[in-house]
From Swiss-Prot:
ZnF start-end (C2H2-type): 216-238, 244-266, 272-294, 300-322, 328-350, 356-378, 384-406, 412-434, 440-462, 468-490, 496-518
Primary gene name: ZNF354C
Major location (coarse): nucleus
Protein name: Zinc finger protein 354C
Subunit structure comment from the entry: Interacts with RUNX2. Binds consensus element OSE2. Interacts with TRIM28.
Tissue distribution: Expressed in kidney and skeletal muscle. Very low expression in brain and heart. Strongly expressed in vascular cells such as umbilical vein endothelial cells, microvascular endothelial cells and aortic smooth muscle cells.
Single GO biological process annotation from the record: angiogenesis
Transport in keyword set: no
GO MF terms, alphabetically ordered: DNA-binding transcription factor activity, RNA polymerase II-specific; DNA-binding transcription repressor activity, RNA polymerase II-specific; RNA polymerase II cis-regulatory region sequence-specific DNA binding; zinc ion binding
Localization of this protein: Nucleus; Nucleus membrane; Cytoplasm
Zinc keyword on record: yes
């Protein structure tokens, strides 16, 4: 198809790049299609403004910027035209156009069209023949494929611009006079082929205009945007402005799209469904993230360590490990965190909130992971096994800490006294010896402790609570460590081995006492007789026996 545009003297107007729908068709569009329409129209308008073309803001753009539905009037081409399709026009009159001569040579016929005094003068016999060709091709493949399959070129020669799209698109939808502006666009008349008008969104996206560059720059951070609307939305990050308010819960948002997504929480609407597992979501972005669970795709990679992530937000949080950045600070204790979720979990320490309850015993937890680990006590599930001694654990962190007994690893070292620990909790408690910090006080006896767990253990002395029970003999203990040591009686496990003679013990305290045999260290003496003893318990037993305590007589 060869096209010659003669006498193209008129500048581009917004009407040239606008698309209009009838009220009836607008109501049949879903939210995603309406959002696409708004995006394309606002971007086309912004692009024309960036070209420096002087014109006032159209009513349609004002409505779209305010988040309103565009007002449209449907008009039909008179029935005697026999074109068989509808045309949607703006309520204002059509602009005047110069003559347009169109040559159709693929089948040896010539078509001429002219626009005089603001009216379209069309050779209708050829138009009907051309429409039938379109319908035949539509039956073979969808409109999107039709557009993709045709070669599209834009060539410029002086003041004349030609656009070649092939025969699948009606000529008037592709060609409008312009003055030396190399941009793609849709004219003031937008045709729908048949009743499947939703496919026209593909056509609309195809003709979206991009004059090049990002002319709209943020004065705060220097970021640039193609559309002024996007710049305005971005600036709300700096100003904190949130103009969109939810009528249900009064929560506010900086973007209208965020408000629409949020409102689906109240309505329960989940229009986006995963074809793999049938799981549904309230917004498309969440569905896209979810699909990566099935595909295993991790498109976001850390430049520092090469670790990959399925979500950009997860990468952002991860990168703060390298930078040391901690944006989220606790208002109670000034402790800072690198992500908001960790701050929320931490704040439950101050509020005492425990939203996760065990259905078996009613015990509450501040974290879901803690509840999941606790529930394994009821089910008896032991997921993690030590390869050295075969011992099983309900938590992987407990297994890692346990394995340090075998390896002797002590990664946590005190900067004050250089003492090392194999558990962070033990290291954290030790540090408070140097600082003298004791935040947690027992209300019964006034004794203070450096950490909350020590206070809880201490309070069991007053309450007599023994929550840890042996599955073998039923004996109960106030501390989990006591239960662990007791279970070694049944298993015969002896973790603590003397490096001098190879003798093994079930308890660390027994190993420590044994080591004094090799060092000949005798710390405990009876003042009356001066007899030395290796451990205090031996001294106590000897004193009772010497004084005639019947409990220790053989």
């Amino acid at each position: 198809m060869a096209v010659d545009l003669l006498s193209a003297q008129e500048p581009v107007t917004f009407r040239d790049v606008a698309v209009f729908f009838s009220q009836d068709e607008w109501l049949h569009l879903d939210s995603a299609q309406r959002a696409l329409y708004r995006e394309v129209m606002l971007e086309n308008y912004s692009s024309l403004v960036s070209l420096g073309i002087p014109f006032s803001m159209p009513k349609l753009i004002h409505q779209l910027q305010q988040g309103e539905d565009p007002c449209m009037v449907e008009r039909e081409v008179p029935s005697d035209t026999r074109l068989g399709f509808k045309t949607w026009l703006e309520t204002e009159a059509l602009p005047h156009r110069q003559d347009i001569f169109i040559e159709e040579t693929s089948q040896g016929m010539v078509k001429k069209e002219s626009i005089k005094d603001g009216h379209w003068d069309i050779n209708f016999e050829e138009a009907v023949e051309f429409e039938s060709e379109i319908e035949e091709e539509q039956e073979k493949k969808p409109l999107r494929q039709m557009i993709d399959s045709h070669e599209k070129t834009i060539s410029e020669d002086g003041n004349h611009t030609s656009l070649e799209l092939g025969k699948s698109l009606f000529t008037n939808t592709a060609l409008v006079t312009q003055q030396s502006v190399p941009i793609e666009r849709i004219p003031n008349m937008y045709y729908t082929f048949g009743k499947d008008f939703k496919q026209n969104f593909d056509l609309m996206k195809c003709f979206q205009i991009y004059p090049g560059g990002k002319p709209h720059i943020c004065n705060e951070c220097g970021k640039s945007f193609k559309q002024n609307l996007h710049l305005i939305e971005h600036q709300r990050i700096h100003t904190g402005e949130k103009p969109y308010k939810c009528n249900e819960c009064e929560k506010t948002f900086s973007h209208r799209s965020s408000l629409l997504s949020h409102q689906r929480i109240h309505t329960g609407e989940k229009p986006y469904k995963c074809n793999e597992c049938e799981k549904a979501f309230s917004n498309s972005s969440t569905l896209i993230k979810h699909l990566r669970v099935h595909t295993g795709e991790k498109p976001y990679r850390c430049r520092e360590c090469g670790k990959a992530f399925s979500q950009c937000s997860t990468l952002t949080v991860h990168q703060r490990i390298h930078t040391g950045e901690k944006l989220y600070k606790c208002g109670e204790c000034e402790k800072a965190f690198n992500c908001r979720a960790k701050l929320h979990r931490h704040q439950r320490i101050h509020t005492g909130e425990k939203p996760y309850k065990c259905s078996e015993c009613g015990k509450g937890y501040s974290q879901f992971t803690s509840l999941a680990e606790h529930q394994r006590f009821h089910t008896g599930e032991q997921l993690y096994t030590c390869l050295e001694c075969g011992r099983t654990f309900t938590r992987i962190v407990t297994l890692i800490e346990h394995q340090r007994i075998h390896t002797g690893q002590k990664p946590y070292q005190c900067n004050e006294c250089e003492k090392a620990f194999n558990q962070y909790s033990s290291f954290n408690e030790h540090r408070k010896i140097h600082t003298g910090e004791k935040l947690y006080t027992c209300e019964e006896c006034g004794k203070a402790f450096g950490c909350k767990s020590n206070l809880y253990r201490h309070q069991r002395i007053h309450t007599g609570e023994k929550p840890y029970q042996c599955n073998q003999c039923g004996k109960a203990f106030s501390q989990y460590s006591f239960l662990t040591e007791h279970e070694r009686i049944h298993t015969g496990e002896k973790l603590y081995k003397c490096m001098e003679c190879g003798k093994a013990y079930s308890y660390r305290s027994n190993l420590c006492r044994h080591k004094k045999v090799h060092t000949k260290e005798k710390l405990y003496k009876w003042k009356e007789y001066g007899k030395p003893f290796i451990c205090s318990s031996s001294l106590t037993q000897y004193q009772r026996f010497f004084k005639g305590d019947k409990a220790y007589e053989v």
